[in-house]
Amino acid sequence: MSFRTRLLFFGIAWLIVLMPFLFWWSTWFGRQLSDAKLNEYLHDVNKPRHIQHALVQLSDRMSRNDPVAKKYYPEMVTLASNPSVEIRNTDAWAMGQDTTVPEFHQALLKMLQDPALMVRGNAALALVRFGDASGRPQIVSLLQSANVLAPATGKLTDTAKPGTAVREGGLIAKVQTGSQTLEARSPLTGRVALVNMPRGAEVAAGAQLAVVDPGESQVWEALRALYVIGTPDDLPAVARYEREQPDLPDRIRQQAILTEHAIRQRMENK
């Protein structure tokens, strides 16, 4: 496959991965911002959602080659290290809109080491458009369940129920330690698959409290990306979704089958 053909393939695949995400974000941040408002929101350090809104608007402008967006590129690179997980998450997606910017590419590569699972995953997905498969392990991790661990030794005073839908950062459990109550939160959006300990149990710091399965959107995006960059090592993670699952639509199963087929075809063509 020639370099040009490979880039075209990556570009088409990126659109497949990107469009569901942009549709979802538009339901939250769809209100169009004027140039003045965009500038105001992007610099509103007291309201992270305003910065997110501005980044989504910038992403849309970048996709339309709006020259106004370019003057904010240095700030987008800076936002890659913002303390807010939500801002870093959105920033990773936005930077994937212009693959001609080496600074974006470098920032996204650094974000593969971000402490937040979803930021790492979104950076990896964005890198696909650059023709860069460096984030493949992070994309595979988007297909895997996440463990929720006890933040400290103490008494488990509250837990979510199995089957509960939860957003990234959603409360899973509370642990009482001395006079303090500490919270254990979900690292991803999905559904509580398992709760390991009952309320009232004594738990040690780092003990597994619950398991959260990834949600539909996350799984869909990861499978689409692996359709393009997946390797034989990824087949076990993909195969899990080839079986019918009550909490996921049939399109996930169908995409998993297509992804496995694409990976095996690449193996045969080598």
Predicted regions and their residues:
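Amphipathic alpha-helical scaffolding segments comprising HEAT/armadillo-like alpha-solenoid repeats
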Residues: 2-3, 28-42, 64-81, 89, ...
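Hydrophobic core positions within HEAT/HEAT-like alpha-solenoid repeats
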Residues: 54-55, 91-92, 109, 123-124, ...
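Short inter-helical turns and helix N-cap capping residues of alpha-solenoid HEAT/ARM repeat scaffolds
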Residues: 46-47, 83-84, 115-116, 147, ...
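Residue-level detector of extended alpha-helical repeat arrays and alpha-solenoid scaffolds
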Residues: 50-51, 88, 120-121, 219, ...
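Alpha-solenoid repeat junctions
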Residues: 58-65, 95, 99-100, 127, ...
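Short beta-strand-turn/beta-hairpin segments enriched in glycine/proline and small hydrophobics
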Residues: 140-156, 171-192, 211-212
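Acidic, glycine-anchored pre-beta loop/turn
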Residues: 157-166, 195-206
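Hydrophobic membrane-insertion alpha-helices, especially the h-region
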Residues: 6-26
